[in-house]
Amino acid sequence: MSRLLLNCDIGESFGSWTMGLDAEVMPFIDCANIACGFHAGDPSIMRKTVSLALSHGVKIGAHPAYQDLVGFGRRSMAYTAQELQDILHYQIGALDGICRAQGGKVSYVKPHGAMYNDMMANPAQLRAVIQAVVAYDRSLPLMLMATRDNTAAQQLGDEYGVTLWFEAFADRAYDSAGRLVSRQLPGAVHHDCETIIGQALTIARGDNLTASDGSALHLQANTLCVHGDNASSVAAVQRIRQALNEQSAP
């Protein structure tokens, strides 16, 4: 079984408002996707989250979004390709500066929410995102959604010489095309701990998932997204980490 990197969306608090159990989940993940202020987070939260990640030896990823604090970055917005690249550079650069001030660095980029979904549905937008990463730092991998067929995205990444990390989700339902089922639909998010752990191990083994229409779905992924929103989800992350370590042990 190939080793999957565990990643988690982190640093999504804002001011005195707290979201997520970042300190509790950080010891069990490989990569922290840190909000950059447009959908969540602020300069102080970003600094504290970077410090936490560095203290645990966790890779830091920029988690940029549309400028949508009210909608938590989950609403599609119309941007030109240049405007999209501008907001990506603004957010990646902000986090990178905070990292450098603490002796760290941004190691990859993972767009958030609607931006993440939109770039998977629109090849022109994916191209614009890749161009933004190339212009900032070609060595940064771009994390994007693993689907039934990663070929088109991989070809675009190869065209620009960008490393792509394909991501699967332990706690989300998939449709037959390998896209995430909309959060507006029932059953889109798994809440049962055993279901989440089972899906994580199925993906790690390279076995087929069952899509929402009952069809078999194979996802070829490099990294697995987990969440630490509450005590039960943190417990699930801990068990996934332990199970993956056991599965990959010689």
Curated annotation (Swiss-Prot):
UniProt signal peptide: none
GO annotation terms (biological process): carbohydrate metabolic process
A Pfam entry, by short name: LamB_YcsF
Keywords: ATP-binding, Hydrolase, Nucleotide-binding
Domain of life: Bacteria
GO molecular function, one term: 5-oxoprolinase (ATP-hydrolyzing) activity
EC number: 3.5.2.9
Keyword field contains Hydrolase: yes
Catalyzed reactions per annotation: 5-oxo-L-proline + ATP + 2 H2O = L-glutamate + ADP + phosphate + H(+)
Classification via InterPro entries: Glyco_hydro/deAcase_b/a-brl (IPR011330), LamB/YcsF/PxpA-like (IPR005501)
Oligomeric and partner information: Forms a complex composed of PxpA, PxpB and PxpC.
PANTHER family in the cross-refs: 5-OXOPROLINASE SUBUNIT A (PTHR30292:SF0), UNCHARACTERIZED PROTEIN YBGL-RELATED (PTHR30292)
HAMAP family: PxpA
NCBIfam families associated with the record: PRK05406.1-3 (NF003814), PRK05406.1-5 (NF003816)
Family: Belongs to the LamB/PxpA family.
Role: Catalyzes the cleavage of 5-oxoproline to form L-glutamate coupled to the hydrolysis of ATP to ADP and inorganic phosphate.
Protein's name according to its UniProt entry: 5-oxoprolinase subunit A
Source species: Pseudomonas fluorescens (strain Pf0-1)
